[in-house]
């Protein structure tokens, strides 16, 4: 079984649809407009709300604050960095070893030509900085 964390959004909804041949659960602070029957409400800022059921083999971590108008800006770090730490702790508690983590091209800065993992980090906003810090946590 896979647990998609943050699967109620745009990317998560399409991912869950593609995983229709697998047993999947969704954990999100928002309800899912398409997969309400497999969605549990939870906020990764609170370790106690990260419910990983027995039989879960992999976590797909999509949850993030990403909009440009997030206020206060500390939410980027509370969700993207501390939330990642909380997910890793919940995984450790449940004995889950596999994580698929989605980062962002925003960690490489503006006007980069096809950056990959070998490019130097040069985040230009709080979202990029927080995703870079989350990568460092993992």
Q: Where do the protein language model's features map onto the residues?
A:
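Rossmann-fold cofactor-recognition segment
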Residues: 33-46
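SDR active-site strand-loop-helix element
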Residues: 5, 27, 59-63, 99-105
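Conserved Rossmann-fold NAD(P)-dependent oxidoreductase catalytic core, especially the SDR/UDP-sugar
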Residues: 86-126
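Conserved glycine-rich Rossmann-like NAD(P)H-binding loop of the short-chain dehydrogenase/reductase
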Residues: 22-33
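N-terminal Rossmann NAD(P)H-binding glycine-rich loop of SDR-like oxidoreductase domains
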Residues: 1-20
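Active-site Tyr-X1-5-Lys
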Residues: 124-138
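Short alpha-helix in the Rossmann-fold core of NAD(P)-dependent oxidoreductases
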Residues: 77-84, 100, 130-131
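NAD(P)H-binding glycine-rich loop region in Rossmannoid oxidoreductase-like domains
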Residues: 44-79, 90-93, 108-112
């Amino acid at each position: 079984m896979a647990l998609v964390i943050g699967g109620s959004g745009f990317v998560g909804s399409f991912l869950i649809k593609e995983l229709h041949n697998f047993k999947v659960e969704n954990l999100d602070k928002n309800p899912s407009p398409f997969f309400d029957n497999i969605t549990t409400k939870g906020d990764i800022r609170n370790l106690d709300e990260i419910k990983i059921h027995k039989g879960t083999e992999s976590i797909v971590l999509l949850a993030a604050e990403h909009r440009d108008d997030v206020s206060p800006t500390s939410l980027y770090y509370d969700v993207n960095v501390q939330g990642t730490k909380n997910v890793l702790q919940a995984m450790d508690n449940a004995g889950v070893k596999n994580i698929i983590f989605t980062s962002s091209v925003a960690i490489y800065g503006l006007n980069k030509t096809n950056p990959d993992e070998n490019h130097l980090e040069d985040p230009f906003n709080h979202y990029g900085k927080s995703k870079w810090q989350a990568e460092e946590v993992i």
